């Protein structure tokens, strides 16, 4: 897996997400065909849990999501890529932002702008997304509509900002040594606890 392959795959995912931000339901199926493996493995929040296939992803995730938030946009704050255990991965965090007009996943609509924080990891093979794991902050979405399932925070509950320098979206190649050092630091924080 060369640096140019990783860079190309990163651009493919960025392009896919950009197209999802600017197209409607009728165009999404062909976009999925261009960027997703037909055997895509998708893992997300309950009650969706897991989805197999790009057509099922549209039916089970995107259609209900865009129905609930018709003007939904993805705002990515951090976007990076690299190899992990011999596989190419793209990872990102940010927010889905849109007007919550219809209930979604049993959460009642507020009619107001909502922010759904996401963390997403997508594995790429031969230019297609073959696996996605996405974390959605549904507890915070529930808080935004007035449902408190956790004790009230002692701090401010609001949008977690991206990097102040606005340089969290890395579309260009990065120094492999610096990338490896960053990965080792993160893994030591995760696995060293």
Ranges and model annotations:
Residues 1-193:
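C-terminal and inter-domain tail/linker signature
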């Amino acid at each position: 897996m060369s640096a140019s392959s990783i860079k190309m795959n990163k651009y493919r995912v960025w392009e896919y997400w950009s197209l999802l931000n600017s197209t409607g339901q009728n165009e999404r199926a062909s976009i999925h065909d261009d960027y997703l493996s037909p055997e895509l493995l998708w893992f997300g929040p309950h009650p969706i849990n897991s989805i197999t296939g790009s057509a099922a992803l549209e039916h089970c995730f995107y259609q209900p999501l865009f129905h609930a938030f018709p003007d939904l946009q993805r705002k990515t704050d951090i976007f990076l890529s690299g190899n992990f255990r011999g596989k190419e991965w793209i990872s990102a965090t940010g927010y889905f932002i849109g007007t919550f007009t219809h209930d979604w996943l049993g959460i009642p609509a507020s009619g107001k702008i909502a922010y759904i924080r996401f963390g997403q990891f997508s594995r790429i093979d031969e230019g297609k997304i073959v696996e996605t794991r996405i974390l959605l902050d549904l507890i915070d979405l529930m808080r935004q509509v007035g449902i408190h399932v956790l004790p009230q925070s002692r701090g401010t509950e609001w949008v977690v900002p991206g990097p102040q320098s606005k340089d969290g979206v890395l579309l260009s190649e990065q120094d492999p040594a610096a990338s490896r050092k960053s990965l080792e630091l993160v893994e030591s924080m995760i696995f060293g606890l």
